[in-house]
């Protein structure tokens, strides 16, 4: 992966120290940053899509990875995730202490650590959203409340509605 990044002169950051990697992959790390071993910063939308496509072709889909809660997985990859947001803090975009974008129709979107994938309403995602994905949980339980969240898993309160 690093040779690809450097050969294409991409901006990136990565976790270097083994102890830091283990810490990042532990349940002690915030859900918004857990699992992010390497982060690439594309220069524009076109390079973003090219990078995703090329990495998807290079990294085996069968390789297990850590699910990144704040990002969206690319296609059926377990290792390639993306999100929308600022690369660095810019004082010109700070509102109420958070990096903020304003849409053409006055919409406001703030970039801060989140536990789920989030796009501004005026930005079209590069993939179709698949909200119909079924799971054992969704097929058998009605969730009433989230009791605890962590990068190691969540605890829910709900009722069984189908055995």
Residue ranges and their predicted role:
Residues 26-31, 38:
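Extended charged low-complexity segments that act as oligomerization/scaffolding linkers
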Residues 35-37, 152-153:
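Extracellular structured ligand-interaction cores
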Residues 1-23, 27, 103-127:
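Surface-exposed, low-hydrophobicity interaction/linker segments
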Residues 42-48:
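Helix N-cap motif at beta-to-alpha junctions
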Residues 60-82:
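Conserved short beta-strand edge segments in small beta-sheet-based binding/regulatory domains
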Residues 1, 144-163:
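ATP-binding glycine-rich loop module of kinase domains
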Residues 88-146:
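Juxta-kinase regulatory segment immediately upstream of eukaryotic protein kinase catalytic domains
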Residues 2, 50-60:
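Short amphipathic alpha-helices in soluble, non-transmembrane regions
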């Amino acid at each position: 992966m690093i040779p690809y990044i450097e050969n294409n002169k991409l901006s990136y950051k990565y976790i270097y120290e083994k102890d830091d990697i283990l810490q990042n992959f532990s349940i002690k790390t915030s859900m918004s940053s857990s699992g992010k071993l390497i982060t690439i910063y594309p220069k524009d939308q076109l390079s973003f899509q090219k990078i995703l496509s090329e990495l998807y072709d290079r990294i085996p889909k069968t390789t297990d990875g850590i699910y990144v809660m704040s990002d969206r997985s690319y296609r059926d990859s377990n290792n390639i995730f993306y999100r929308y947001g600022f690369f660095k803090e810019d004082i010109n975009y700070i509102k109420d202490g958070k990096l903020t974008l304003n849409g053409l129709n006055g919409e406001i979107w703030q970039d801060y650590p989140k536990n789920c994938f989030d796009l501004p309403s005026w930005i079209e995602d590069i993939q179709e959203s698949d909200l119909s994905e079924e799971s054992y949980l969704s097929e058998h339980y009605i969730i009433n409340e989230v009791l605890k969240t962590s990068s190691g898993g969540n605890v829910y309160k709900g009722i069984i509605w189908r055995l």
